[in-house]
């Protein structure tokens, strides 16, 4: 419906423009009422005058603009169009409003009816922008169709000259200029008015009325079974047949859809060139005048059915759309080319400006270089004199610097020698510290060993005291248990002997540990003396180091908890006491 609306708007635009006498874009309300009523009548749309009054209620005085009329036209008329109207009658109504005010007063070789058909064809081929024009490509297409319909040869060179003259003045032709062009006979020289009129009518039937093919053929009746000559007209979805080609007496229609088909039939009953059109409800037997016409009709009907199945528009409408798309594509390419040319031109101008700027910069640079060269030559002599004085001064300074460097080198060598001596002393001091550290580690190891031995000794002593108490308890037992206790005492005595031996062994180990501790202590004192000696030497050289000597230690027994709470004499006294108690118990 969008395409139908655009086609209707073109004809309505002509009618509205004709009513706009002063070209101001405004038409009086009374004229719009008449136009709206006529449009509703020819388009089979119910007319609502109240809606028009309501739409323009704020503009009762004076004319109203076409911007205000367009919303009304779209809402109350065009949106209600269903397509069940006479296209020719609609166009003729719009033509009646605009023809008298726009047709040329000069005599034309075509009739008013032919001019009307050319005007309708113009609306079909014109561009979808206002004011309406037909571009030269579509003019060429139309003239070729007319020339072909007249059976004449196409004059391409003549049209090229006309096209060149046309392109220099405007983009295309208006409807009235196209009518003047065809009516002037410029491209139909040697043809009479009747031939031109027939050609216009043929092109009108094809492009506007969607007539794909027409002609006389015989049709077999369904009731009486007789053959009657009819004038057949093939359109995209229907085949209509009439009594004659004036289309006044219509006898019937053959409705086409995607389920229809056409088949050739063999000759029979004296009829030749037969073919059959099959539809859902009935079939039609047709007889053409010759085999060529038969094949043309079969091919045309098959093509029409194929288009119906595919949902495609008629060939001439599809071709028009393709031509428009091609023109749009070429126009886009041309605009892109023009844009690129403008960019190149702009870039070229920018380059020229840059070159001019560079040239000026080079000239200025050359002038500056000449001036600088002059200044350089002038200052060169001054610099040479100044450099000579500075050279003498530098020689004297260099001599003084060499003397200072020699003195500093000697001082540096002495300083490095002292540094090497200090490094050697530090190295020896580090070795002495390592020896002292190792001696302290040995002392700690011996101390831990002595503590472990004392702990084991204490455990054995506690065990011996426990056994002694048990022996005293066994003495107080009865005589009946004495023998058994004696045996147990002998066993315990043996165990006590073993424990005493272990205690003696531990005593020996403790003494050995004390001896090792004394040796380690001597080594530690020796290492401390060596460390103190080296530290004194380092302090003597540096004047900084002062060693603090540790105080002397008295030898004493060491346990896991520190110095022992008893002496060796007390330990021997306790051993004698334990032996005496053991002997008395026996």
From Swiss-Prot:
Its main location: cytoplasm. The SWAP complex consists of NPM1, NCL, PARP1 and SWAP70. It comes from Gallus gallus (Chicken). Tyrosine-phosphorylated. InterPro entries: EF-hand-dom_pair (IPR011992), PH-like_dom_sf (IPR011993), PH_domain (IPR001849). Phosphatidylinositol 3,4,5-trisphosphate-dependent guanine nucleotide exchange factor (GEF) which, independently of RAS, transduces signals from tyrosine kinase receptors to RAC. It also mediates signaling of membrane ruffling. Regulates the actin cytoskeleton as an effector or adapter protein in response to agonist stimulated phosphatidylinositol (3,4)-bisphosphate production and cell protrusion. Residues 210-306 form the PH domain. This is Switch-associated protein 70.
């Amino acid at each position: 419906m969008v395409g139908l609306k655009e086609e209707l708007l073109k004809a309505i635009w002509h009618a509205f423009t004709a009513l706009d006498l002063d070209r101001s874009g405004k038409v009086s309300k009374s004229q719009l009422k008449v136009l709206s009523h006529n449009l509703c009548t020819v388009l089979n749309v119910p007319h609502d005058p109240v809606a028009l009054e309501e739409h323009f209620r704020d503009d009762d005085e004076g004319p109203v603009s076409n911007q205000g009329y367009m919303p009304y036209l779209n809402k109350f008329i065009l949106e209600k169009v269903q397509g069940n109207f006479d296209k020719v009658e609609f166009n003729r109504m719009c033509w009646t409003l605009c023809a008298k005010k726009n047709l040329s007063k000069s005599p034309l070789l075509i009739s008013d009816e032919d001019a009307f058909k050319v005007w309708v064809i113009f609306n079909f081929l014109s561009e979808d922008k206002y004011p309406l024009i037909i571009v030269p490509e579509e003019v060429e297409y139309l003239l070729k169709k007319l020339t072909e319909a007249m059976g004449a040869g196409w004059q391409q060179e003549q049209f090229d000259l006309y096209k060149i003259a046309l392109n220099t003045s405007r983009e295309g032709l208006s409807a009235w200029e196209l009518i003047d062009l065809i009516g002037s006979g410029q491209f139909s020289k040697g043809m009479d008015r009747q031939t031109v009129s027939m050609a216009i009518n043929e092109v009108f039937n094809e492009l506007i009325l969607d007539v794909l093919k027409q002609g006389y053929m015989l049709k077999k009746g369904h009731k009486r079974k007789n053959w009657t000559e009819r004038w057949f007209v093939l359109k995209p979805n229907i085949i209509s047949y009439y009594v004659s080609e004036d289309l006044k007496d219509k006898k019937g229609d053959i409705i086409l859809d995607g389920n229809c088909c056409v088949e050739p039939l063999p000759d029979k009953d004296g009829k030749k060139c037969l073919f059959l059109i099959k539809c859902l409800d009935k079939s039609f037997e047709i007889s053409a005048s010759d085999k060529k016409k038969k094949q043309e009709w079969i091919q045309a009907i098959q093509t029409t059915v194929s288009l119906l199945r595919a949902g495609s528009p008629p060939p001439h409408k599809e071709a028009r759309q393709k031509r428009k798309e091609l023109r749009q594509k070429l126009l886009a390419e041309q605009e892109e080319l023009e844009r690129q040319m403008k960019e190149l031109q702009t870039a070229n101008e920018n380059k020229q400006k840059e070159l001019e700027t560079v040239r000026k910069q080079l000239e200025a640079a050359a002038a500056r270089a000449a001036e600088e060269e002059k200044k350089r030559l002038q200052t060169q002599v001054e610099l040479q004199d100044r450099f000579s004085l500075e050279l003498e001064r530098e020689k004297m300074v260099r001599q003084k610097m060499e003397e200072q460097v020699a003195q500093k080198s000697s001082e540096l060598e002495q300083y490095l020698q002292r540094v090497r001596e200090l490094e050697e002393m530090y190295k020896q001091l580090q070795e002495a510290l390592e020896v002292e550290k190792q001696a302290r580690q040995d002392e700690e190891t011996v101390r831990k060993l002595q503590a472990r031995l004392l702990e084991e000794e204490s455990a054995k002593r506690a065990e011996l005291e426990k056994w002694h108490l048990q022996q005293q308890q066994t003495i107080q037992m009865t005589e009946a248990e004495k023998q058994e206790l004696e045996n147990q005492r002998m066993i315990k005595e043996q165990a006590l002997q073993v424990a005493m031996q272990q205690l003696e062994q531990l005593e020996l180990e403790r003494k050995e540990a004390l001896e090792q501790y004394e040796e380690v202590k001597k080594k530690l004192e020796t290492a401390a003396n060596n460390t103190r000696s080296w530290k004194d030497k380092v302090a003597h050289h540096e004047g900084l180091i002062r060693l603090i000597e540790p105080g002397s230690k008295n030898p004493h027994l060491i346990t896991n908890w520190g110095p022992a709470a008893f002496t060796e004499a007390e330990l021997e006294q306790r051993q004698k006491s334990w032996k005496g108690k053991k002997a008395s118990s026996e």
